[in-house]
Amino acid sequence: MLHVTFLAHSGFLVEDGKRCYVFDYYKDPNNIVWQLAKRGRELWFFVSHTHGDHFNPSITEFDGPQTRYICHQDVPLESKVKKCITMRPGQDALLDDVGIHMYGSTDEGGSFYVKTNTANIDSDSIFHAGDLNWWHWLGDTPENNADAKRMAWREFKELDGLAVDVAMFPVDNRLEDAMEWGSIEFLRRVQVNKAFIPMHLNGPLWTPSVYFKALFGEVPIWEPQKDGDEATF
């Protein structure tokens, strides 16, 4: 069972009953993570890349015996906290009984797949995309958008056959008519069992298009309505 709390933008807290996994902490208007830290909960911070809307250097303030940091290799944290590992796309890590694989990105950094207990085949799994998306900008040049498509196809191909329980993926309003393209290609390749969660909206809440619903009407979707919303899967 996973309890998911939307912090803001692309930031999420995922609790599995033992640990608190914090993905791309940018801001936490409701001080949810601080409350957990004060209660001595085990906090694992995942940082996909250094963009200011995915990485807040203040996460070093949570450092302590119950805190770990798992970061893309470009994130400058390793010398500033006690327990930090850095990863690059294609790399695996095993920390305690938690399995982590870093997939690629179509922008900076990488994306995370987390298996909460590698000793139990039925344990929960989490995918956080970071800035992995099909970044097709309607006002951009045909050449740039062709490059964006090639990059997206290259990274999505690595995900073929993956199954996850909860997946957090960008559905960015700034892409206008192309805002769902990345999520469509992602879901064509990845089986999401419990919740597909849109993030990185940069605008109003997402209403899935008729086309999206026709393709993925059976995919469970949870869309947070505001910072601090939570659900259990």
Where are these regions (language model features)?
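Metallo-beta-lactamase
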Residues: R68-S123, E218-F233
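Active-site HxH/HxHxD metal-binding segment of metal-dependent hydrolases
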Residues: I32-A93
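Active-site neighborhood of phospho(di)ester-bond hydrolases with catalytic His/Asp-centered motifs
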Residues: V22-Y26, R41-F55, I70-D74, F127-D131, ...
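Binuclear metal-ion centers of metallo-dependent hydrolases, dominated by the metallo-beta-lactamase
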Residues: V4-S10, V81-L95, E158, M179-F233
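Active-site-proximal beta-strand elements of phosphoester/diester hydrolases
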Residues: H3-F6, Y21-D24, V98-S105, S123-D131, ...
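Active-site environment of divalent metal-dependent phosphoester hydrolases
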Residues: D28-N31, T50-F55, V75-S79, Q91-A93, ...
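Active-site-proximal loop/helix segments of hydrolase catalytic cores
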Residues: E108-R189
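Pre-active-site segment of Zn-dependent metallo-hydrolases
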Residues: G11-T50, P57-E61, L132-G161
